[in-house]
């Protein structure tokens, strides 16, 4: 596998892969970088490189998210056993944009399919392979998620005439 293919994949898919990984972990850039490193060390390139990258990113992000949750639980237990030194600020959280919040409020399966299809450019067949479902189920999740997003964001989709 040549550096041209790797460079082209990074240029065209890295941003969407970061967005995809962000669903599960707080370090999506690291996960995507690790996925590209794994891709570069493959003796034989996968048949569908983009779908392969999404699979590796998904697995890595889920693992990183789980590790972060375990670390957070451990740190919370340790912090609960010591007296607090500071009063927490009431406005510690950052307000995200409305669309980002709406997307984050979707069920994970719907959010995953929407991000993979819109920003990742994956087909519903590739998404089905990635999520272990059928293409029709992936499409149903996509349509349902878009419907919820439209409702929450107040976006009206023009209807098509029925014959």
Task: Give each language-model segment a name.
Residues 1-29, 40, 44, 111:
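A short, charge-rich alpha-helical start-of-domain segment used by transcription regulators
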Residues 104, 108, 120-140:
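Helix-turn-helix DNA-binding module
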Residues 48, 58, 62, 131-157:
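DNA-recognition helix of helix-turn-helix
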């Amino acid at each position: 596998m040549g550096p041209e293919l790797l460079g082209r994949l990074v240029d065209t898919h890295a941003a969407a892969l970061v967005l995809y990984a962000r669903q599960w972990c707080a370090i999506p850039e690291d996960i995507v970088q690790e996925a590209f490193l794994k891709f570069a060390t493959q003796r034989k390139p996968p048949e569908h490189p983009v779908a392969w990258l999404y699979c590796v990113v998904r697995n890595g992000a889920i693992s990183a998210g789980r590790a972060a949750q375990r670390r957070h639980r451990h740190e919370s237990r340790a912090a609960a056993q010591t007296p607090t030194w500071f009063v927490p600020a009431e406005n510690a959280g950052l307000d995200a944009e409305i669309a980002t919040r709406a997307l984050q409020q979707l069920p994970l399966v719907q959010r995953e399919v929407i991000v993979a299809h819109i920003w990742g450019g994956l087909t519903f067949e590739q998404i089905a392979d990635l999520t272990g479902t059928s293409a029709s189920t992936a499409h149903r999740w996509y349509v349902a998620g878009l419907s919820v997003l439209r409702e929450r964001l107040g976006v009206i989709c023009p209807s098509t005439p029925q014959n």
